[in-house]
């Protein structure tokens, strides 16, 4: 999160969902009167075109056509006792909004998760108890209307700034996944509860840069997953608004039969 983060995100205006790919019907009638084989289709959910933010804690998206649509609901599942959505000054609340810029070195705008501590005296460190870290976190849940396969996306802007924030991200799902940083990224960890994705060092990175990205790929069909965003920078400065934000890139996945 670089200094330009504030005032650069806007809520996505609602429009009819963009058809990212035509979806094959699970069972179509073949020319000989039999049942045609279902063919999975690769789809792309673009936040700027397919998503509607209904509040700072909820939104929804849909891709597909009139015959078959994949819907996604995004909801805040929980928030810690020392965490609020938006910034500390309460002048901006950009949680679950779509960025006004392309994120993480991609060509697409991203979905923001934006939060801040309520009290600086209750901030957590990486060595704090699990309970204290939970107070300084927010969990967002993603639910698809039906299982999708080969789901993949980036989490961008996982960075840190002294006396401000230190990003950590935990992913949980019944489906197995991998989460890792690529060449040139400073992100460490694998996204699990014991090894969260996290800033590899204290360095604020511009939101448009790919140097703080992690790639998440699900290895089996998935219906839902959750993402817990934590702050483990215990220090603070009264002159610094301690808000933090990460972004999700567009989602790519394949329909299932």
Stretches found by the model and what they are:
Residues 1-16:
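N-terminal secretory signal peptides and thylakoid transit peptides that target proteins
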Residues 144-152, 221-224:
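Extended extracellular/luminal ectodomain segments enriched in beta-structured repeat modules
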Residues 36-133, 172-194:
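N-terminal targeting leaders for non-cytosolic proteins
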Residues 89, 162-172, 241-246:
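Short coil-to-beta strand junction motifs in C2/discoidin
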Residues 177-257:
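Terminal, low-complexity interaction segments
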Residues 129-145, 160-169, 209-216:
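Short beta-strands within extracellular/lumenal beta-sheet-rich domains
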Residues 148-162:
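A short beta-strand element within beta-rich, extracytoplasmic domains
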